Design a protein with these regions (language model features):
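DNA major-groove recognition helix of helix-turn-helix/homeodomain DNA-binding modules
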Residues: 55-71
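Short, charged recognition helix plus adjacent turn
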Residues: 1-7, 70-87
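Short, solvent-exposed alpha-helical "recognition" segments
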Residues: 51-54, 81
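A short, Lys/Arg-rich alpha-helix, primarily the initiator
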Residues: 1-23
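Recognition helix of helix-turn-helix/homeodomain-like DNA-binding domains
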Residues: 36-52
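Short basic helix-loop element that most often maps to the first helix and adjoining turn
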Residues: 15-34, 59
Length: 87
């Protein structure tokens, strides 16, 4: 099994997370404060060094004022899995 951390789809998810943060006009420092994390942790997640689990993703999005379900729908519309990419 390959690691999804390195897939195009995961990179698209990270890019969308960055867009959501910048659209909300929230810096990495401010997001870190809202999450009670460090700015380095936020940066590591946004660059793919550290993986977010689904619970962390939900908390992250809530801190920015977004719902997980809406984020997943948006991600799915811009990065659909091809049949041969399904896990």
């Amino acid at each position: 099994m390959y690691k999804t951390l390195y897939t195009r789809e995961y990179q698209q998810m990270l890019a969308l997370l960055r867009v959501k943060r910048t659209d909300a006009q929230v810096s990495q420092v401010e997001l870190a404060r809202r999450l009670a994390w460090t700015q380095a942790d936020v940066s590591k997640c946004e660059t793919g060094v550290r993986r977010l689990d689904v619970i962390e993703l939900r908390i992250w999005l809530k801190a920015l004022g977004y719902e997980l379900a809406d984020f997943v729908r948006e991600l799915d519309s811009c990065a659909p899995l091809l049949p041969d990419q399904a896990l």
